[in-house]
Amino acid sequence: MSVHREIPLDFDGVLADEGNGSVVRRSVLPGGVRVLTEAMPDQRSVTIGYWVAVGSRDESPEGYGATHFLEHLLFKGTPTRTAMDIAAAFDRVGGESNAGTAKESTVYHARVLDEDLPMAVEVLTDMLTSSLIDPDELETERGVILEELAMDADDPVDVAHEKLAEVMLDGHPLGRPIGGTPETIRAVTRDHVVGHLSLIHI
């Protein structure tokens, strides 16, 4: 399956012109998805990112940490790709992929050579639209996330940021830790993660 095709863009304008041949443009796909592009004529590599306006603030009280789980689990397989297939697609071409969770957004991104952009678009789109959210992988990632939280708890800067948000925004979803807490991560179920995935509209 290939998603590489010409898609008509409704051109919306130039956002920034750096004067060095690098111009940021904003376009809109027919379904309403906003596309920002920046051409860098001297570069052969391409970075693509899907910024989703769903973050930890959107979690239900009983599903704190679901965004962080989702960030991990989207890389773990679709009906047409295993986790190994997803990783190998980028490794094979010397590319890389990753994701990051924030309070109000999540980003899934990849960097490849320009000739491999269609592959990167296809794989990232498959991950975002067809993830299996495998129960066994969820349990594996639960351990990984608990280790990440333990490492964060050993970093004074991370602890200070989390405590400041907690005190300043007491009771508000923005005051909660982005990654959840050990207690909430232990309690997150597959249903919480699938419910959170349903908030993402591609």
Named regions from a protein language model:
Residues 1-9, 22-23, 28, 39, ...:
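Charge-rich, well-structured scaffold segments of protease-associated domains
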Residues 16-19:
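Short loop/turn motifs at secondary-structure junctions and domain boundaries
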Residues 42, 47-114:
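M16/MPP (pitrilysin/insulinase) zinc-metallopeptidase core fold and M16-derived inactive scaffolds
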